[in-house]
């Protein structure tokens, strides 16, 4: 069927900021879809609030609106643009929920706008728990015994009838938000109450728990002619009961018989046909390990996290083809872009095993609740490909960047058997490592299967890995044992550890016996047809399918899995760098391990290696490809940390040289450079042990800011006020980076700002200065940033620009550089310099129109700023005001304190732009879901050192109609100063404490600060948690509250008696 001619203009709804449950996979899907629609000649309008994406680049759509994804703003854009149709299925849950809201508000009918891909009825049937249940019954598809509830009492009655455990699934939420497994009435009441609150339709499904069944997923496609196929089937290592986003997943399925596979495949195709979905769909099923009994768990009527994984696992571009199906094309008339000869109707066949392991944020949140359940907690994921399961699993383990090179954590060797068994039964994010430790201690896989319900097949693979370890221990320097270990995915580092040698010895031994990996192509057809894709994975076999081309090549290292501190911003820079390399006439090669991102789309680069970002794996690619050089600037700390070892091995690092990277990272060298350049910095010293740190703090004077060197995202950074706190910090935080010393700095409580600069070594372009709303002490990634600066004098801006130029030239920076400053009493101090792309590059590129990563790459390849037509110095400022605001995922992370400090906690960002600061702030707050009522009750609970400042805010809140409430100490201070506040009770005072008031809807906002030391007391954390759980705006920095107040004041009329 030919594409539709009756529509010309299509609006695509993006997925908004990155949060847990909705990450970079939607940037990948949205980018693919927009380009596919443009390719077919449609005019594409994109709406998204996230500036950190490739999707929001000008060339991706005809018109791009970076605006809040709220009904108010999307409605305005629709009325302005008048699209013929909207494609909502590529924006995750956000896109689907927005489509439903537009329909319910009558906007789609009013303007005669059609929904493409998935009809409203299908979204409703898949997402509304009652309608889904009815549909499954009509199709004769089994679902667990369940009921729909709208109150907690209804849930309790049903559970009493069918017995515990039960699962709670809120309707229309993402990543299992608000859901969970309940083993008791108390748990059921708590989880259902929260789930009803988080469901936009106040509805939860309560169902009989089938925890322990195998969890299987089918990624299916269907077109308007009712052609349907299975793109990929996947099997979770963990049984039902753990969210699939938090499970280790293998593709294709590993333990199903042919009969089971056909049975579940038929069910999946029956469901997509019944829903009449045109595009991609994900079906999750539970299979009884001991019979042919199965249940349908849920259906996602859209492109999802699993679609991105299935696309990368098979090479089949689901989002691209789904977009074309949405405009009428059919599977039997579209060519599969991988083979270039077969049609998209051919089901992909895999002659390899793919492993996905989630990446969790618990290295950042040590006190977070790590136990896994039906609510997702992972921030990102890694994928690895191998010829056997062991190989793909071990490659994925070393891709995680959590300090392991194998499925082994050495720290676990010290724990008791009792603790080990507990951790094996109660699944946490690191259960794989506990299982492997149990096998090393001699627990049988049958025992472990009965404790965990993990299939014996998977446990046997873990046992096989342990057997190879034992074989290596018994046969040191034995070539056949080495060959076997490499065939099953063991790293040189692990083998060296077992043989008590250096990694370089193993590498030398391999090379002396010509034992090197070959690279196989991902071709969707198990080599049945010729494929043209430059998409490769390594394995230890005979035939190499990756041939070095005659063209000079450049290798760009990606940034690995998405985690807090290193998000999609770095992937954005990687993709732009590749474009510039190709324009310069080189072959661009990407190496990365993240299946969610645009950089691992095989059509982006000339060659893609889906490999772990370790020294060994990178060197193997370099040995084969012999690139002209390697670019490490765009891969965040992941790539920077590899620069030294690659350089030592004789690899050419392009751009800023390793010794200059070191001068920015090494404290003593950096101090020396600043002295030579005449640039002030807060007084500071380096310490390698407790005594030195205490001596440094005594000399500098408390409070001090302490942190390890060579870290990203403020990892283990803290402000300490006295000796005891400093001792405690040294005992707990040095783990963060043991081979590097601790930095002890004078803490300056001033205004912070940051600069991204691009240098060719002689000239320096500064696209803009970003002013932070929150003062020093809040991590830059968690601060709201304003461009152009609103409160910095011309002189201060000139000083910042001058210091930046001196630094870039003095540190021999070629390419990107990020500098952070603090300003106090009109004095500018440098806090830190990062000689690489930073997380603000996409934001600043969008608001200034300067393609920063592309320019930096051209300079790295030898051009000058003058060649490219750019002047030296600060670029002319934008006429609009732009705000970058952080977005947090605290609702998904129980027991993680939402108090902001020097360690980064945000998972994503949004942008607000307008003609004034107030309007831009309003948009930013709307986009990051901080909706504040125009009046109501606001609670102040304030530390002594900021009560005076809070008082003036409270007076302003009162002037616009807010009722002021306060805790005892704060209320007393306010009263002394002539402002009366309603007293709220102490925690535990059931009728009147803050959590109770919040729960009953009597509080519209909370302002809570904890003083310079930032040690969170238990009461404070309970107050903050109650605000997060109930969705009440919470301000832990007075500057953020002040910004919100500015917005409210600008929206209020002045009402005064004459």
Swiss-Prot record:
List residues binding Mn(2+) 4: 832, 834
A GO molecular function term, named singly, is: ATP binding
Give the span(s) annotated as Carboxyphosphate synthetic domain.
Answer: 1-401
One Pfam family matching this protein:
CPSase_L_D3
What EC number(s) does its UniProt record assign? 6.3.4.16, 6.3.5.5
Locate the residues binding ATP 2. 707, 746, 748, 752, 777-780, 820, 832
Task: Quote the SMART domains the UniProt record gives.
Answer: CPSase_L_D3, GARS_A, MGS
- Binding-site residues for Mg(2+) 2, renumbered to this chain: 298, 300
Enumerate the PROSITE patterns for this protein: ATP_GRASP (PS50975), CPSASE_1 (PS00866), CPSASE_2 (PS00867), MGS (PS51855)
**Can you tell me which residues bind ATP 1?**
129, 169, 175-176, 208, 210, 215, 241-243, 284, 298
Q: Which keywords has UniProt assigned to this entry?
A: Amino-acid biosynthesis, Arginine biosynthesis, ATP-binding, Ligase, Magnesium, Manganese, Metal-binding, Nucleotide-binding, Pyrimidine biosynthesis, Repeat
Residues annotated as binding Mg(2+) 1 are: 284, 298
- Indicate the enzyme's highest-level EC class: ligase
Q: Where is this region: Allosteric domain?
A: 930-1058
Q: In its UniProt record, which GO terms are filed under biological process?
A: 'de novo' UMP biosynthetic process; glutamine metabolic process; L-arginine biosynthetic process
Residues holding Mn(2+) 3: 820, 832
**All copies of domain ATP-grasp, residue ranges:** 133-327, 671-861
* Pathways involved: Amino-acid biosynthesis; L-arginine biosynthesis; carbamoyl phosphate from bicarbonate: step 1/1; Pyrimidine metabolism; UMP biosynthesis via de novo pathway; (S)-dihydroorotate from bicarbonate: step 1/3
Question: Where would I find the MGS-like domain in this sequence?
Answer: 930-1058
Residues the record lists as binding Mg(2+) 4: 832, 834
Q: Which of this chain's residues are annotated to bind Mn(2+) 1?
A: 284, 298
Entry binding sites for Mg(2+) 3? 820, 832
Query: What protein name applies here?
Result: Carbamoyl phosphate synthase large chain
Gene encoding it?
carB
């Amino acid at each position: 069927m030919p594409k539709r001619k009756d529509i010309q203009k299509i609006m695509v709804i993006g997925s908004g900021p990155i949060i847990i449950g909705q990450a970079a996979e939607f940037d990948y899907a949205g980018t693919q879809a927009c380009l596919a629609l443009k390719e077919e000649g449609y005019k594409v309008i994109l709406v998204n609030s996230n500036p950190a994406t490739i999707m929001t680049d000008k060339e991706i759509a005809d018109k791009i609106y970076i605006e809040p994804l709220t009904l108010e703003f999307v409605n305005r854009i629709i009325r302005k643009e008048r699209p013929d149709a909207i494609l909502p299925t590529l924006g995750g849950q956000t896109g689907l929920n927005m489509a439903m809201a537009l329909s319910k508000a009558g906007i789609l009918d009013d303007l005669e706008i059609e929904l493409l891909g998935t009809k409203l009825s299908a979204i409703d049937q898949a997402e509304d728990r009652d309608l889904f249940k009815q549909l499954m019954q009509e199709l004769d598809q089994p679902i667990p015994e369940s009921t729909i509830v709208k109150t907690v009492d209804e849930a309790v009655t049903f559970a009493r009838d069918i017995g515990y455990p039960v699962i709670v699934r809120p309707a229309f939420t993402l990543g299992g938000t608000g859901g969970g497994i309940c083993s008791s009435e108390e748990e059921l009441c708590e989880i259902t109450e929260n789930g009803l609150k988080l469901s936009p339709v106040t509805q939860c499904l309560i169902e009989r728990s089938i925890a322990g069944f195998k969890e299987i997923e089918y990624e299916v496609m269907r077109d308007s002619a009712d052609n349907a196929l299975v793109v990929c089937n996947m099997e979770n290592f963990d049984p039902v009961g753990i969210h699939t986003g938090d499970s280790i997943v293998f593709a294709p399925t590993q333990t199903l018989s042919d009969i089971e596979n056909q049975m579940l495949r038929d069910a999946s195709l029956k469901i997509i046909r019944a829903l009449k979905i045109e595009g991609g769909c994900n079906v999750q099923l539970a299979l009884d390990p001991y019979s042919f009994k199965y249940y349908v768990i849920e259906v996602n009527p859209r492109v999802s996290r699993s679609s991105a994984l299935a696309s990368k696992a098979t090479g089949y571009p689901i989002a691209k083809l789904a977009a074309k199906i949405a405009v009428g094309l059919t599977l039997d008339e579209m060519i599969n872009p991988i083979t270039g000869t077969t049609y998209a109707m051919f089901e992909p066949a895999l002659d390899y095993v793919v492993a996905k392991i989630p990446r969790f944020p618990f290295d950042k949140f040590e006190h977070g609740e790590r136990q896994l359940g039906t609510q997702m907690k992972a921030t990102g994921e890694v994928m690895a490909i191998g010829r056997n399961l062991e190989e793909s699993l071990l490659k994925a383990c070393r891709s995680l960047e959590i300090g392991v090179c194998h499925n082994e954590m050495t720290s676990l060797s010290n724990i008791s058997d009792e603790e080990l068994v507990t951790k094996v039964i109660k699944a946490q994010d690191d259960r794989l490592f506990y299982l492997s430790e149990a096998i090393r201690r001699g627990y049988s896989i049958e025992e472990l299967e009965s404790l965990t319900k993990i299939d014996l097949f998977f446990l046997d693979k873990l046992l096989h890995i342990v057997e190879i370890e034992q074989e290596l221990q018994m046969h040191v320097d034995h070539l056949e044992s080495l060959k076997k270990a490499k065939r099953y995915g063991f790293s040189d580092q692990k083998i060296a550890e077992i043989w008590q040698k250096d990694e370089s010895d193993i590498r030398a031994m391999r090379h002396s016996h010509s034992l090197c990996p070959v690279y196989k192509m991902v071709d969707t057809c198990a080599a049945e047809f010729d494929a043209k894709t430059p998409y490769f994975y390594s394995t230890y076999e005979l035939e190499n399918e990756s041939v070095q081309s005659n063209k000079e090549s450049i290798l760009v290292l990606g940034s690995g899995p998405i985690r807090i501190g290193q998000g999609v911003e770095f992937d954005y820079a990687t993709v732009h760098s590749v474009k510039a390399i190709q324009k310069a006439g080189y072959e661009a090669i990407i190496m990365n391990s993240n299946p969610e991102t645009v950089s691992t789309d095989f059509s982006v680069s000339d060659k893609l290696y889906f490999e772990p970002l370790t020294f060994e794996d990178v060197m193997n690619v370099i040995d084969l490809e012999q690139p002209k050089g390697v670019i490490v600037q765009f891969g965040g700390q992941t790539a920077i940390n590899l620069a030294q070892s690659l350089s030592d091995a004789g690899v050419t690092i392009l751009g800023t040289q390793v010794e200059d990277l070191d001068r920015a990272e090494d404290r003593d060298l950096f101090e020396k450079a600043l002295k030579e350049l005449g640039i002030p910095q807060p007084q500071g010293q380096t310490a390698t042990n407790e005594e030195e740190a205490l001596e440094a703090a005594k000399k500098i004077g408390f409070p001090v800011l302490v942190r390890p060197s060579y870290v990203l995202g403020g990892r283990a950074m803290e402000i300490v006020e006295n000796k005891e706190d400093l001792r405690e910090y040294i005992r707990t935080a040095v783990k963060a980076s043991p081979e590097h010393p601790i930095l002890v700095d004078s803490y300056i409580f001033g205004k912070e700002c940051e600069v991204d600069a691009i240098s060719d070594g002689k000239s320096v372009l500064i696209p803009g200065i970003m002013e932070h709303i929150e003062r020093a002490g809040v991590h830059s990634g968690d601060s709201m940033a304003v461009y152009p600066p609103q409160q910095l004098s011309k002189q201060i801006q000139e000083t910042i620009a001058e210091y930046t130029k001196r630094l870039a030239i003095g540190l021999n920076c070629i390419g990107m550089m990020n500098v952070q400053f603090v300003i106090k009493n009109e004095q500018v101090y440098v806090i830190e310099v990062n000689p690489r792309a930073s997380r603000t590059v996409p934001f600043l590129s969008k608001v200034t129109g300067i393609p920063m990563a592309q320019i930096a790459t051209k300079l790295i390849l030898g051009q000058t700023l003058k060649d490219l037509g750019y002047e030296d110095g600060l670029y002319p400022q934008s006429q609009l005001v732009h705000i970058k605001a952080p977005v947090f995922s605290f609702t998904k992370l129980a027991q993680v304190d939402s108090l902001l400090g020097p360690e980064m906690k945000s998972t994503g960002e949004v942008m607000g732009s307008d003609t004034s600061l107030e309007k831009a702030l309003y948009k930013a707050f709307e986009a990051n879901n901080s909706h504040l009522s125009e009046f109501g009750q606001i609670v102040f609970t304030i530390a002594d050192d900021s009560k005076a400042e809070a008082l003036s805010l409270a007076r302003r809140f009162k002037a616009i109609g807010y009722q002021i409430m306060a805790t005892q100490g704060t209320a007393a201070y306010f009263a002394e100063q002539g402002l009366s506040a309603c007293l709220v009770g102490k925690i535990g005072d059931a009728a009147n404490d803050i959590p109770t008031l919040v729960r009953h809807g009597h509080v519209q906002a909370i302002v809570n600060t904890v003083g310079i030391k930032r040690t969170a007391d238990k009461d404070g954390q309970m107050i903050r948690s109650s605000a997060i759980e109930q969705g009440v705006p919470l301000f832990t920095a007075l500057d953020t509250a002040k910004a919100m107040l500015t917005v409210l004041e600008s929206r209020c009329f002045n009402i005064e008696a004459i």
